[in-house]
Amino acid sequence: MRHLDSSIPDYVADQISDRCLRCYDEQQWYGKNFLFDYIGDLDVTGKKILEIGCAEAGLMKFYNDKGAICSGLELSDIRFNNAMLLNQDQSIYLFQADICKPITYENKIKDTYDIIIIRDVIEHIPEQELALKNMYDLLSVGGKLFMSFPPKFCAYAGHQQTVPKILGKLPYLYLLPNSIYVFYLKLIGCPEKKIQYLLDTKRTRITISKMKKIINRIGYDVQKKSNWIIRPAYSFRFGLPRILNPFSWIPILNEIFCNGMLFLLTKEQR
């Protein structure tokens, strides 16, 4: 079976890659099995929720089914088209835009949001502080922002797990100097487009300490944070139990052994 959501018609599933169908399943699973409880709002009926980098918008489908008023912003043509195909019967407002460029979304957003979610996306954005400042402006007073990302020096911060060949999936491989990294990737037959993606990701990675400084400068309040050695999504992907990083209190080790850093931030009245 190519996907877990039996409500997806075959003619829709046939237009979408197996990987993206699995991402759609994971997005719904993540909302149901982790994020809903982590954010802590027992009733989201009527709440306005925006996901930045919604991809297939499976997470927004979960919240839409819970009664929330959901919107999804996506930059990628492929992922946006996937979202439109998969959510044809959902009342989710989907639009293409760049969170770093308000001109691309200001005519599509008419109100502020109670909850904004940016899950494993911020590490791909070159202008991270600008993106988070723009999200702050889109958040209602008292609203919450959930953000997750793999820190700069963790085992798979370079996203090399997406390389097709097993020899490209080695932990910490991205820490090689670029010239050696590219040579190795070419040697194992990695496509040029994938190599460029990996180099782009390597360039935009961010440390936990730098992210904390950005959060403070913008004016977010930290309601909750957690540092995971086996992050929640790994339960879906690999059947592993989620485990907090036992070294989270030790500088450097808190970065190296963290495979997922999570923040729940709020915008308070000033």
List PLM regions with ranges.
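A short beta-strand submotif of the Rossmann-like class I SAM-dependent methyltransferase core
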Residues: 118-121
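Conserved N-terminal segment of class I S-adenosyl-L-methionine
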Residues: 1-111, 115, 132, 227-232, ...
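Active-site micro-motifs of SAM-dependent methyltransferase domains
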Residues: 101, 123, 154
